[in-house]
Amino acid sequence: MKISQKGLDFLKDYETLSLQPYSDKIGLKSAPIKSWSEAATIGYGHLILGTEWSKYKTGITKQQAEDLLHSDLVDFEACINKEVKKQQLSQNEYDALVILCFNIGITQFKQSSVLKMLNGLKGNYPTLELAWKAFNKDNGKVSNGLINRRASEWNIYSKNVYKRIN
């Protein structure tokens, strides 16, 4: 499977486009950064590797951001396609899982109670919804933005509603 256009549009809305590199630890409202850090980000949430810094340090075009997002999504789609053993995901379930994985990362997703529960194993939470919404912390602190994002993703997964909660 691949993410749908509705899923892609939803992801782009949450990730927000930045044509200049910024620190994801500070957020989009920060000034563009002039040197690489582990949180260096560009486009729609693309984490810039140290080896990529010279390529992205002066910024990118909107088309390059689109291309980068599509390239990044290949790994997240492959993760969901490989790791989720549920017999058949609906498109909205798949979209929500790709969006979650994009935000928390492949390693976190593979270790998550969300994946365990989807695959019929016991997780650390009584319900899949609670396991999903547990990814609500930024640097160890509960984040209202992440609470809203997880609720929005859950609505996609459980209700097929692609609407951002603010």
Model regions and ranges:
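Long, amphipathic alpha-helical surface segments
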Residues: M1-D9, D13-K34, H46-I48, W53, ...
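Extracytoplasmic
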Residues: S37-A39, Y94
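Short hydrophobic-aromatic micro-motifs
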Residues: T41-G43
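Family-specific signature for flavin-dependent thymidylate synthase
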Residues: W53, T58-K62
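Short, structured surface segments that line ligand/substrate-binding pockets
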Residues: K82-N92
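Noncatalytic nucleic-acid binding interfaces
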Residues: L97
